[in-house]
Amino acid sequence: MDISLDRLWDEALGHLQVQLSRPTFEAWIKTARAESLVDNRLTISTPSEWARGWLQKHYASTITEVVQRVAGIPLQVEFSVAPQALVEEEAPSTAVASTSRKAGSFPASAPLGLEVSGSLPMRAPDLNPKYSFSRFVVGPNNRMAHAAALAVADKPGRAYNPLFLCGGVGLGKTHLMQAIGHYQLEANPRAKVFYVSTERFTNDLIDAIRRDSMQSFREHYRDVDILLVDDIQFIEGKEYTQEEFFHTFNTLHESGKQIVLAADRSPHLIPRLQERLCSRFSMGLIAEIQPPDIETRMAILKKKAEYEGMILPPEVIEYIATTYTSNIRELEGALIRAVAYVSISGLPMSVETIQPILNPPSEPKEITPDMIIDVVCEEFGVDRESLLGSSRKRDISQARQIAMFLMRHHTNLSLPKIGDYFGGKDHTTVLYSCEKVSQLQRENLQFERQLQNLAQRLRVMANSRNR
């Protein structure tokens, strides 16, 4: 076999990254290491016995198939435990986290296993103060959801459990969820209310697995009175996240604790959702929120203006409500733009004044790979041929990595397709480039702002070219 152990595992990781879901890869595969290759027997080390058992049970055949394909010969795969590798790798960040974490916080990046004064940190409700029942406008589109949320807030764990709120983007699901939390905390300040997005739940789970601190993770999520989980549709296809959430759900439900979930669709329309989870999500009440009608949209604008101290003529309210029909977020955004424009320009508030700046909302335009190449070349002063070529000069190499990162995040191209765009580079090279840019983005605020600026330029370019 004419391939080194490191190269074999690096190429295998690239294939597994493409085949498996991102949380699965991050939690189980990325933390493993190729330990040795002797007599066609590949030993893969894992950071804990838990991880070794899970890989052996669920991914042994997949990993074996991939490494054999990369090596070109039959291989036997074995799994071992080598926790010291992970401890050494994570030690610097763990030390920083232990000294800098504030009481009352639970960041996704902080080690779950660390304790403060002998116990896990208090969880902050993380609720938006504006999302209260008093600021929620009730209409025919959301009356049932509002009534159900009030019932749950008044008698958590007894009215509807779980309460599943579903509807499109910007229709008030998050507002109602957090209003439940505010209501309960006002009635009982000692209540343990926890609002979390599904992405945060998944990230915390991955972090716990990597640090072998699942017990702390479970205590954190299961020792609550009300659990509010937003965007639960993003649990689709995440097998281990679904497994863990299933047991979290059962523990809370059996203890009479309230669970409120929100998604952009009903449970049975979420693809690759375990049947048992779909059944549990549906066992309480599913309350759908529809787009608001014209009267409700006008009422929303009036209430928003009232809270913000704005004075709006009736015809302006009607114009905005007629122009923006799909969701509340766009509606309120249009109102803010109109008020800001009038304030800055000094013009009177009228339909004629705001009409030019409130064009009807349009679908976001597509960002193409060629646009990304153009913007990156201009930003870094390199030519297209060099960027797409194989030059190893530092400035060109960095610009190329940024272009790959932008393609991954702003187009639908797969890693292999991005590699093809850059002269047939292997998808592992693309993955490495994207991870390197992500790391620099986290560590360097100026670099993060540069990436944000590039993304904004791409959106402007896409809108101008696709008109």
Curated annotation (Swiss-Prot):
Alphabetical list of PROSITE patterns matching this protein: DNAA
Note down the stretches annotated as region Domain III, AAA+ region: 126-342
Any one of the GO CC terms: plasma membrane
Q: Which residues cross the membrane?
A: none
Query: Could you confirm whether the keyword Heme appears in this record?
Result: no
Ligand binding (ATP): G170, G172, K173, T174
Query: Annotated region Domain I, interacts with DnaA modulators: where?
Result: 1-85
Q: Which Gene3D superfamilies match?
A: 1.10.1750.10, 1.10.8.60, 3.30.300.180, P-loop containing nucleotide triphosphate hydrolases (3.40.50.300)
Q: State one molecular function term (GO).
A: ATP binding
Keyword ATP-binding among record annotations: yes
Q: Where is this region: Domain IV, binds dsDNA?
A: 343-467
Q: Which UniProt keywords apply?
A: ATP-binding, Cytoplasm, DNA replication, DNA-binding, Lipid-binding, Nucleotide-binding
- One GO BP annotation here? regulation of DNA replication
List locations, semicolon-separated: Cytoplasm
Renumbered residue ranges of the record's region Domain II: 85-125
Comment field on protein domains: Domain I is involved in oligomerization and binding regulators, domain II is flexibile and of varying length in different bacteria, domain III forms the AAA+ region, while domain IV binds dsDNA.
What is said about its interaction partners and assembly? Oligomerizes as a right-handed, spiral filament on DNA at oriC.
> According to its UniProt record, which protein family does this protein belong to?
Belongs to the DnaA family.
State what this protein does. Plays an essential role in the initiation and regulation of chromosomal replication. ATP-DnaA binds to the origin of replication (oriC) to initiate formation of the DNA replication initiation complex once per cell cycle. Binds the DnaA box (a 9 base pair repeat at the origin) and separates the double-stranded (ds)DNA. Forms a right-handed helical filament on oriC DNA; dsDNA binds to the exterior of the filament while single-stranded (ss)DNA is stabiized in the filament's interior.
The protein depicted here goes by the name: Chromosomal replication initiator protein DnaA
Native species: Synechococcus sp. (strain JA-3-3Ab)
